[in-house]
Design a protein with these regions (language model features):
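Histidine-centered catalytic/metal-binding microenvironments
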Residues: 1-42, 173-277, 547-659, 938-939, ...
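Catalytic alpha-helical scaffold of carbohydrate-active enzymes acting on polysaccharides/glycoconjugates
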Residues: 249-264, 288-300, 316-374, 388-396, ...
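Aromatic-lined ligand-binding clefts that engage carbohydrates, nucleic acids, or primary amines
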Residues: 83-111, 633-635
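C-terminal (or distal) subdomains of carbohydrate-active enzymes
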Residues: 390-396, 409, 418, 434, ...
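The substrate-binding groove and active-site-proximal loops of carbohydrate-active enzymes
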Residues: 124, 230-239, 269-285, 308-317, ...
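Short beta-strands within extracellular/lumenal beta-sheet-rich domains
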Residues: 61-81
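Beta-strand-rich ligand-recognition modules
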Residues: 102-164
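Catalytic grooves of carbohydrate-active enzymes
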Residues: 203-233, 270, 274, 408, ...
Length: 1014
């Protein structure tokens, strides 16, 4: 017999789409619909239900961009519906859904008339099974339906991910016209056997598409599908579905092979805390998703769902307390699993060390206190690369495991492992898994399962991987169709063997199976999204400033509490921290969200700054009294201008050398006795002479403090990406409009395009340091502004500050891994050097850098450090970065790594001038005598006990020994984890009263808790 497999497959697909799918509902019944449009921002159910609803016709338009319409659906279930076990009564809703991804368009949430949330309706989850809810729209067993649907008219900002500029990301420019038409709001009588038949078709057709064309198993499946289609009557699918299913049952009953890859399927919904929607919409997305999950758990007791981000649970508790209690019950039963340990799924490249610590402190404390769960994993599937400081921080918070899949997005290199141990800068290792399915939004279809098995790098050693399944990014979560797929692939020949699982079960099993995996040392650099280090500079500046204000506020508040007995503002500090932690979400701090999000972030940072300045002012008054004497407070970990670290005084040291600025024919000469700098008439630095080392720092013929403008047109992902080809087009900004001496500094102004730059250049007193303040009125589009410092230093690597230390990165391009790091991230400083000489470049708000090698007349290698100051991407915010910006940069010559550390703190924590009583000083609450041991935080304990908590780290990459002294009465000193729980000492050698001797490994992070004497 002539048999054409491809024709059979086409026949099966058409039969499924044209006959089976339409037959899943035997019949439908209309409902009466009325509607009320919310005038402005969303309201809660009680306000909506009390409003005046107007009759609404199915087919009519609704929903201005970002608007909300409440629909009220009433009616009765027809007699005889749902009378047998093969049918179910459902509410079926189509809000005008498009082909866009769920979570990127209209969404709805269904309530009973009493205000109980039932579940969400979304493009691929449109039905509400009324029969599964006690009183789900009915009361006292009646057949009446009375339901409300809160419909969100969220615009599809992403479109087809074509990255075109759009006004939809700003509520003020998004327009007023309706976006959607209500296509369907009615009752449907679900034919359960037909629906099950549809799931059989999906499983088997998907499987055969993944099998080799010449495989026996594929041929068997094709024949069985062909027979099933023959056996069913296309005019009576309901009546013949059982026959078709009986034929397909034999294909589905063939068990998986003993060597089949084992998939731990974990329900999940990646919900971006903001991205192409504002934070306020995320709050509703969380409620919609979590209600879906609770509904699914009620009907599938084996289903396990994992959700990260304590912030999202906190929103649920605040705005949807009844739903939060339902989630709490599911957590107690083990079906709903909090994961991730963090307040949000944070970026990990740019947050400072203490901020990353607080992500874990805030997240883990919430999960422990509210849900009784001590989370043990770091769950960051979508962040844009992972700092080498993260393993130590995670382990210090009690985390054992780490999961991401984002490195699968690498443009150049493929990570060699999926299961391994990841080692951080201090040597801490954490068991790590990259799901080889390469997505956190799996549908558990055959294509995803086959990809997981095909790409799994540990074949022959390991046998298992984790697959997160459920609609995500904009939420939604798993569906009943996905659970049906899991059921059919539990043991199915030709497919990996799927089991519903949890992250904990997977990691325990993977560790047991693979106790000695390979080790990856250092950062997990993402070869993609490099522009995220620079986009939305105001958001990044707000983050950096907030982090350092928080340090100051906690330090001075703790000092005032201990010394002056004032109340510690724990509540205000917690609010400030939680606000900052939210802004560190991996689409906010990286600058990759819509305009609405970044405008809101700026307002949040301003509010945080106001609150923290008030705390600092109140603390200073308590410590210094009310007077007119200027007092300088130094929150930095090392002395500045004679002001002690973590202390204050009204007397600063007098500069020992003269600081001169003279105009010459060729330009200007600045000299402070440490450095002599020559600047030409164009405002470019032509010479920096280190007088102590008798060494020239600027290569012959080069110019430092050179602003360079690049065309910045990435191939895709505008705000996210800087592509390597940007380097091919560059304009050196050398035209100067104004250059003059004023206030012992050189001031210069340049104009280019529609923009203007004003710089102030000066030498620091008594230090070989140049300070440059750059103010930009930025009105470019798709341009990248960099600030270049060519240096006469021979280096093959550069040190960049990260959390609690620094990493060395090659600056040559010997390998594809080296070449791919053409843009890197640093915190407060970078350092390049030879064995006995170096230069540090520090900043107060910049993260993106590129550091390259050059040559002087082809003979000697030089090094160029460039800071990425500003970008101007067009998507998702077409006005990103437009307006005013200020950046401070310093260049210290003859710098060691310790010098770089001090310089980074100096630039970010300048001396603070306050007023107090003459002669008043603020003695440091804590002192440390080891130069390499840096105090990162001084605060009171989270538990309200009044204990003083001090966080320290070794900053130079060396072994360090030093004494930490509490300058107040102490009963005991203990070493704790990051959650301030006592642990066995790893660094404490001995304690003598208030003094503790520490021995630290390179980059070791330590938390000490001082119990105060009454």
């Amino acid at each position: 017999m002539l048999y054409n497999s491809s024709l059979v497959e086409a026949r099966v697909r058409r039969f499924r789409s044209e006959r089976v799918v339409p037959a899943t509902y035997r019949t439908t019944s209309p409902l009466a619909v009325s509607a009320w449009e919310v005038p402005d921002e969303p309201v809660m159910f009680a306000d909506a239900a009390a409003s005046r609803f107007q009759p609404f016709q199915v087919g009519a338009p609704w929903g201005r961009p970002w608007g909300t319409v409440w629909f009220h659906a009433t009616g009765a279930v027809p007699d005889g519906w749902g009378a047998d076990s093969d049918t179910g009564v459902e509410l079926v809703v189509d809000l005008g859904f498009t082909h866009a991804q769920p979570g990127f368009q209209a969404e709805g949430m269904v309530y009973t008339a009493s205000g109980r949330i039932l579940k969400a309706v979304e493009p691929l989850n449109r039905a509400l099974p009324l029969s599964f809810h006690s009183g789900g729209g009915a009361s006292d067993g009646a057949r009446l339906v009375d339901l409300y649907i809160e419909a969100a008219a969220n615009p599809n900002v992403a479109q087809e991910m074509d990255f075109f500029p759009t006004p939809l990301g700003d509520k003020t420019t998004a327009g007023e016209g309706p976006l959607y038409r209500l296509r369907r709001l009615e009752l449907g009588l679900l034919d359960i056997p037909v629906w099950q038949l549809e799931q059989d078709f999906v499983a088997l057709v998907g499987l055969l598409e993944q099998l080799p064309a010449d495989s026996q198993r594929r041929a068997e499946i094709v024949h069985m599908l062909d027979r099933a289609v023959d056996a069913m009557d296309p005019e009576d699918i309901a009546g013949t579905a059982a026959v078709g299913r009986s034929i397909l049952a034999s294909a589905l009953a063939r068990p998986a092979s003993a060597s089949a890859h084992r998939v731990h399927a974990v329900g999940h919904a990646h919900i971006d805390s903001a991205w192409l929607w504002p934070v306020r919409e995320t709050v509703r997305k969380v409620a919609r998703t979590f209600s879906n999950v609770c509904d699914l758990i009620d009907r599938n007791p084996d289903f396990v769902f994992a959700a990260s981000s304590a912030q999202q649970y906190a929103w649920l508790k605040e705005f949807y307390p009844d739903l939060f209690e339902r989630v709490r019950d599911k957590v107690a039963s083990g079906n709903f699993v909090p994961v991730g340990s963090m307040w949000v799924e944070s970026d990990t490249n740019m947050p400072g060390g203490e901020a990353l610590v607080r992500q874990f402190v805030a997240g883990k404390r919430f999960f422990l206190e509210e849900l009784g769960v001590d989370t043990q994993e770091v769950w960051l599937p979508d962040s844009f690369g992972y700092s080498a400081g993260l393993p130590q921080i995670a382990a210090g918070a009690g985390a054992r495991w780490f999961l991401t899949q984002k490195t699968s997005w690498n443009e150049t290199n493929v990570m060699p492992h999926h299961t391994f141990r990841w080692e951080g800068i201090d040597g801490t290792q954490i068991f790590t898994h990259f799901p080889p399915v390469d997505t956190y939004n799996s549908d558990l279809g055959a294509a995803d399962l086959a990809r997981a098995e095909r790409q799994y790098a540990e074949k022959g050693i390991g046998t298992m991987s984790l697959v997160p399944f459920g609609h995500g990014d904009g939420g939604g979560g798993p569906t009943r169709e996905m659970l049906a797929a899991a059921e059919r692939t539990r043991s199915l020949e030709g497919s990996p063997a799927v089991s519903l699982s949890s992250p904990h079960r997977f990691f325990k099993a993977a560790e047991a199976e693979y106790p000695h995996p390979p080790v990856w040392s250092g950062e997990l650099y993402l070869e993609f999204h490099r522009g995220a280090y620079t986009s939305q500079a105001r958001t990044k500046r707000g983050n950096r400033r907030s982090e350092h204000l928080l340090r100051e506020a906690e330090l001075w508040a703790a000092t005032a509490t201990v010394r002056a007995g004032v109340d510690y503002p724990a509540g205000a500090l917690q609010d400030a921290w939680r606000t900052v932690l939210l802004q560190q979400f991996h689409d906010i701090l990286p600058g990759t969200s819509i305009a609405w999000v970044h405008q809101e972030a700026e307002r949040n940072y301003a509010r945080v700054a106001e609150s923290l300045e008030q705390i600092i002012d109140t603390s200073a008054r308590a410590l210094l009294g009310r007077g007119d004497r200027k007092v300088l407070l130094n929150a930095a970990p090392s002395a500045q201008d004679g002001i002690p670290a973590l202390g204050g005084s009204d007397t600063r040291s007098t500069p020992t050398g003269a600081n001169s600025l003279r105009e010459r024919d060729a330009g200007f000469v600045l000299d402070n006795g440490k450095v002599r700098m020559s600047i030409d008439r164009a405002g470019l630095i032509r010479s920096i002479r280190d007088l102590g080392a008798d060494r020239e720092v600027v290569p012959h013929g080069a110019a430092a403090n050179l602003l360079q403008l690049h065309r910045d047109t990435p191939t895709q992902w505008d705000a996210w990406d800087i592509d390597e080809h940007y380097r091919r087009t560059v304009t050196d900004l050398t035209d100067v409009e104004i250059i003059e001496i004023a206030d012992d500094a050189l001031h210069l102004t340049r104009r280019f395009g529609a923009s203007r730059v004003t710089q102030t250049v000066r030498l620091a007193d008594d230090a070989p340091t140049i300070d440059i303040r750059t103010e930009v009125e930025w009105h470019e589009r798709q341009k990248l502004l960099k600030l270049a410092f060519p240096l006469d230093v021979h280096a093959d690597r550069a040190a960049s500050e990260i959390q609690f230390g620094h990493v060395y990165r090659p600056i040559h391009t010997n390998t594809s891994w080296d070449a791919a790091r053409f843009e890197t991230v640093a915190h407060r400083w970078v350092h390049v050097g030879e064995s006995n000489y170096g230069v540090a470049v520090a900043n107060d708000s910049t993260y993106g850098h590129d550091i390259t090698r050059g040559h002087t007349q082809g003979r000697a290698s030089t090094t160029t450090v460039r800071l990425s100051l500003l970008r101007a991407p067009l998507f998702p915010d077409p006005r990103a970065d437009q307006g005013s910006h200020t950046m401070n940069v310093s260049l210290r010559v003859g710098a060691t790594i310790p010098d770089a550390v001090r310089e980074g703190y100096r630039v970010n924590l300048p001396l603070r001038t306050v007023r107090g009583v003459e002669g008043t000083e603020v003695g440091p609450l804590i002192t440390v005598d080891g130069q390499a041991i840096v105090i990162e935080a001084v605060k009171l304990a989270e538990d309200g006990s009044g204990d003083v908590v001090v966080r320290l780290y070794e900053a130079h990459g060396t072994r360090a020994r030093g004494r930490v002294t509490a300058n107040f009465g102490v009963l005991a000193v203990t070493e704790t984890d990051l959650l301030e729980r006592e642990v066995s000492p790893t660094s404490m050698q001995n304690t003598d009263g208030p003094t503790t001797t520490l021995e630290l490994r390179p980059f070791q992070l330590v938390t000490l808790r001082f119990t105060r004497a009454e």
